[in-house]
Design a protein with these regions (language model features):
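Acidic, glycine-rich calcium-binding repeat modules characteristic of RTX/beta-roll
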Residues: 2-5, 10-68, 80-90, 141
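Low-complexity acidic/polar repeat-biased segments
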Residues: 1-2, 71-140
Length: 141
């Protein structure tokens, strides 16, 4: 698996490459997840520095979600799998899109999990969250 390290500045990152780990390094980074991620791609996001945001753009279609104590796995409707490690280091922005100047509904990791039907993050293992949903406006539908 390849790793793409971004800068120490505030980067806008649009993950799309299969078999790639994206690292923002320093700075307040924004990761944009959309339906443009290739079918069956495997993507990992890790960023432990800065105030980082995962934006799930309007129309993103998600087949399943899985939550662990500090990670989330999103399986998109096209079979792509996006794993976010260190998820407590991120805010989650439903409907946001920095490239379009759009702000969505922002929550921390626990709030994002709750919005996906997980009332409490597990201390070990993982639990399933929402499935067969899409981002409509600033909410799951």
């Amino acid at each position: 698996m390849a790793t793409i390290n971004h800068s120490s500045g505030a980067d806008i990152i649009v993950p799309s490459n299969n078999g790639t780990t994206y690292r923002g390094l320093g700075g307040d980074d924004t990761y944009i997840l959309s339906n443009s991620i290739a079918a069956n791609a495997a993507i990992t996001i890790v960023d432990t520095s800065g105030a980082n945001t995962i934006q799930l753009v309007n129309g993103l279609s998600v087949a399943s979600t899985k939550f662990a104590a500090d990670a989330v796995q999103l399986t998109l409707s096209n079979g792509a799998v996006v794993t976010i490690n260190g998820a407590s280091n991120f805010d989650f922005d439903l409907g946001g899109n920095a490239t379009a100047g759009t702000s969505g509904s922002v929550s921390d990791f626990a709030g994002f999990a709750a919005g996906a039907g997980v009332s409490a993050l597990p201390s070990s293992g993982s639990v399933a969250g929402a499935s067969n949903v899409s981002v409509q406006g600033t909410a799951w539908s």
